[in-house]
């Protein structure tokens, strides 16, 4: 339809076309169609009217153009270069004289004149208290910062601001994203080593990781001189600690607790504002049971410690100390009993006013070395910390004894770090300093020498090698006796325990591991026998030896399969002592566990009468009856022999 309306190379505008179509469609009926001839005539008439109007305006336009051309012809000729290539005209510079108002004198006079003018900054800057805390990790300080923000917001009705804290769950979401994409080496989740909280209450909270806190060293930056305050504290203030409740006991440690019963926690220690009762786990401790540290820093404060008698002792001023605290003495003693040496050493400076501070630290190290969790590799560091605290030049008798116990425990764990000779040299130094060396210390070294693996390993079968081990042990014992004035050790030899330990030094350590104080389960294995043990046994009367010492001699003979001295000693016991159930059970157990048929036949056929009492009766109980049954079954599996003894054992077993 567009071609119908083409007139002299022009096309009607869409608006005109729509208007014409609408105009002519309104006059005609829809069935008659569109009258294109009438439309064409109307368009031709409009074109003629337009041309006449243009002819009327032609003289005016020509006059305007003539004026423009005439004006341009009178002006200078148009340059051939464009405006951006033309040469710029030179800029004229004219000097300007301005009076600055400065005097004409020299600069020194000007400086002196300016020095008379004093400028004072009258802006008021309020004092800010700083709380410095440490966290175990970035997640730890993140959680602690969130808890502090919650306490300030919900309990004190303030809106604190923080830096270094991310949005809630930001770390968790980023960590999940890392796991999902498996790009842990390339992606890093939000991390922070320093969190700063403005409480809007006059103090700021800084929470660091341990490394960041040491690097920033914020304590020295905010350390100013201030008046020292004396605080009197009595043991009644810490009555909650004796009841087993764990709350904040000082400004240097938060401990978890059930209820906020500490009087110091009833009000804010910084602002003095009363706290609202709340179930927030951060109020008065960590309710989840996790132990967290939040250290406070106060400039050049005085550390106080409490004695049991109610008095308080002020510590010496230590400007280098950045974490003062108030801790009762019994808490240190409790940590020492638990073997928490790190806790005691971290607060060792707080113990300065106490005379027995070194003894407490040494006791903590001793108990630490006795813990089942302490291993071989923990000994060197513990020994190094011991000698950092222990000073032989000014040590008291309790300190010498406590340090000796620690070294003995260290020797039992790691004889390479603390050999036997080091223990002997320690006692020599103790005696040279004027401190008394008691017999239990000598006996302790003997016991440690016997039970240690420094000189022997289980299963030495060579007699020559075993004699070398015995010589080393005897040399240590001899050196101990001679070094401390016991040349004629009559007192010690009269002691049954010392005799038992000497016998143990001559006996190889076996899988039975029979001790010096308690009789262990007897298990014999064939080992070489040192003849000095036999000489010691024959030189002592049976009456001065108790059952434990006799067990050592019997076990030593059974371990070496030396049955002649074994039954010879049994005859001596039968003549000089009374037979009881313990003695019978010891002999039968050693023979049965030896798994030697020679010992079976000799005991059951010829030496069984040595186990009978004065009336000729064999002491029997269920344990002895069971072992006798095993011996008789090994010798006579068919049950034809030992009919009378079998009848007695069966009666005992089924009675």
Swiss-Prot record:
It comes from the Eukaryota. Residues 54-64 have a biased composition (Polar residues). GO terms for biological process: mitochondrial gene expression; mRNA stabilization. GO terms for cellular component: mitochondrial inner membrane; mitochondrion. It is found in: Mitochondrion inner membrane. The keyword S-adenosyl-L-methionine does not apply. Keywords: Membrane, Mitochondrion, Mitochondrion inner membrane, Transit peptide. Transmembrane segments: none annotated. Residues 44-53 have a biased composition (Basic and acidic residues). It is a peripheral membrane protein. PANTHER family: ATPASE SYNTHESIS PROTEIN 25, MITOCHONDRIAL. Probable mitochondrial mRNA stabilization factor. This is ATPase synthesis protein 25, mitochondrial. It comes from Yarrowia lipolytica (strain CLIB 122 / E 150) (Yeast).
């Amino acid at each position: 339809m567009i071609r119908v309306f083409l007139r002299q190379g022009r096309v009607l505008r869409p608006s005109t076309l729509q208007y014409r179509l609408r105009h002519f469609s309104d006059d005609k009926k829809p069935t008659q169609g569109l009258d294109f001839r009438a439309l064409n005539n109307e368009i031709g008439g409009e074109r003629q009217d337009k041309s006449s109007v243009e002819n009327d305006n032609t003289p005016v336009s020509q006059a305007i153009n003539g004026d423009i051309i005439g004006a341009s012809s009178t002006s200078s000729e148009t340059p051939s270069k464009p405006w951006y290539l033309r040469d710029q005209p030179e800029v004229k510079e004219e000097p300007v004289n301005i009076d600055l108002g400065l005097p004409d004198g020299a600069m020194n006079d000007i400086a002196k004149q300016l020095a008379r003018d004093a400028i004072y900054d009258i802006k008021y800057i309020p004092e800010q208290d700083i709380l410095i805390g440490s966290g175990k990790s970035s997640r730890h300080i993140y959680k602690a910062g969130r808890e502090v923000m919650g306490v300030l917001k919900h309990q004190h009705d303030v809106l604190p601001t923080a830096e270094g804290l991310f949005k809630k769950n930001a770390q968790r979401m980023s960590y999940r994203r890392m796991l999902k994409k498996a790009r842990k080496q390339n992606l890093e989740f939000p991390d922070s080593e320093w969190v700063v909280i403005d409480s809007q209450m006059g103090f700021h909270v800084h929470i660091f990781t341990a490394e960041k806190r040491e690097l920033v060293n914020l304590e020295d930056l905010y350390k100013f001189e201030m008046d020292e305050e004396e605080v009197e504290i009595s043991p009644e203030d810490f009555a909650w600690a004796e009841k087993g409740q764990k709350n904040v006991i000082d400004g240097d440690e938060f401990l978890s607790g059930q209820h906020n019963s500490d009087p110091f926690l009833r009000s804010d220690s910084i602002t003095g504002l009363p706290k609202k009762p709340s179930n927030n786990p951060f109020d008065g401790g960590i309710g989840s049971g996790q132990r967290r540290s939040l250290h406070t820093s106060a400039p050049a404060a005085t550390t106080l410690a409490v004695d049991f008698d109610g008095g308080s002792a002020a510590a010496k001023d230590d400007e280098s100390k950045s974490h003062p605290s108030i801790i009762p003495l019994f808490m240190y003693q409790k940590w020492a009993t638990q073997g928490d040496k790190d806790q005691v050493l971290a607060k060792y400076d707080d113990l300065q006013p106490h005379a027995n501070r070194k003894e407490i630290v040494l006791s903590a190290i001793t108990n630490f070395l006795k813990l089942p969790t302490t291993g071989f590799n923990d000994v060197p560091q513990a020994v190094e910390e011991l000698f950092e605290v222990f000073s032989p030049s000014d040590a008291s008798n309790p300190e010498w004894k406590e340090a000796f116990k620690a070294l003995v425990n260290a020797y039992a764990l790691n004889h390479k770090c603390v050999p036997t000779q080091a223990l002997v040299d320690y006692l020599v130094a103790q005696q040279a300093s004027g401190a008394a060396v008691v017999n239990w210390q000598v006996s302790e070294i003997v016991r440690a020498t016997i039970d240690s693996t420094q000189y022997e390993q289980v299963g030495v079968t060579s007699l020559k090698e075993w004699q070398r081990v015995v010589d080393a042990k005897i040399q240590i014992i001899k050196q101990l006796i001679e070094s401390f004035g016991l040349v004629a050790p009559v007192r010690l030899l009269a002691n049954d325990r010392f005799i038992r330990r000497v016998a143990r030094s001559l006996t190889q350590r076996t899988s039975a591991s029979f001790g010096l104080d308690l009789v262990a389960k007897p298990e014999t294995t064939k080992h070489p026998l040192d003849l000095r043990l036999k000489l010691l046994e024959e030189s002592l009367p049976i009456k001065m030896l108790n059952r434990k010492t006799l067990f050592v001699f019997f076990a030593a003979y059974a371990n070496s399969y030396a049955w002649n001295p074994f039954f010879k000693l049994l005859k001596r016991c039968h003549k000089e002592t009374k037979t009881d159930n313990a003695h019978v059970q010891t002999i039968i157990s050693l023979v049965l566990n030896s798994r030697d048929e020679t010992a079976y036949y000799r005991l059951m056929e010829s030496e069984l009468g040595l186990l009978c009492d004065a009336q000729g009766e064999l002491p029997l109980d269920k344990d002895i009856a069971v072992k006798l049954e095993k011996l008789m079954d090994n010798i006579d599996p068919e049950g034809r022999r030992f009919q009378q003894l079998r009848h007695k054992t069966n009666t005992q077993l089924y009675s």
